[in-house]
UniProtKB/Swiss-Prot annotation:
InterPro entries per the UniProt record, alphabetical: MPN (IPR037518), RadC_JAB (IPR025657), UPF0758 (IPR001405), UPF0758_CS (IPR020891), UPF0758_N (IPR046778)
NCBIfam families referenced in this protein's UniProt entry, alphabetically: PRK00024.1, radc
GO BP field: proteolysis
Residue ranges of domain MPN in the record: 103-225
PANTHER family, A to Z: DNA REPAIR PROTEIN RADC (PTHR30471), UPF0758 PROTEIN YEES-RELATED (PTHR30471:SF3)
Descriptive protein name: UPF0758 protein Smlt0399
One MF annotation (Gene Ontology) recorded for this entry: metallopeptidase activity
Amino acid sequence: MPIHDWPEQERPREKLIARGPTALSDAELLALFLGSGFGGRDAVQTARDLLQAHGPLRVLLDRPAAELARLPGLGPARSCTLAAGLELAHRYLAAELEHGEAVGNNPAAVGRYLQHRLRGQAREVFMALFLDNRHRLIACEELFHGTINAAPVYPREVVRRALLHNAAAVILSHNHPSGDPEPSSADTRITDELQQALAMVDVRLLDHFVVGEGRPVSFAERGLLSPPQPRLFG
């Protein structure tokens, strides 16, 4: 049965207007992006087929647009629509950090942004957010790229980038492609090294987020960062 013949309260668009987007299933939300069905099936059925064959939703949408375009029921136009929707979400989350408020006062927004930016990456990516003395965002950079289970991290380069941006503080993040966000012993060790290296140039490490499935793990929230140490001379 075509969607326009469904009861009005069950049609995805009308349901969203009446009850909000959280009331829709993954297939119904995806159907709104598709607009119409494929191969004699309506948009919701087509969305369910895509999720069953190529899902779940995150796995499907993490594919590059060119790969999405080759899937039955998508094609170039629909794959571009999905890619544009994801980029809008990315920019919305980035805007939470870029409108002048102190990033250090909004760890939830930082975690959401980093999760969206790093989750689903096939290889480890190590990035840094550079902040001014009021903890406002100056720049966000991907610094190192690695393999499926490791990324080389060079403290000297992190310090160099912090000085280049005249940063007063830094938030670090990397992903675990395995999906497990629990910090490894290597994560803890390199975080300690980076914190010490940054402290030598009076740059404070505010946090280190590890991104996987679910909520990112925050070193600061876990109490895994060393307390700032006074610099002694003499």
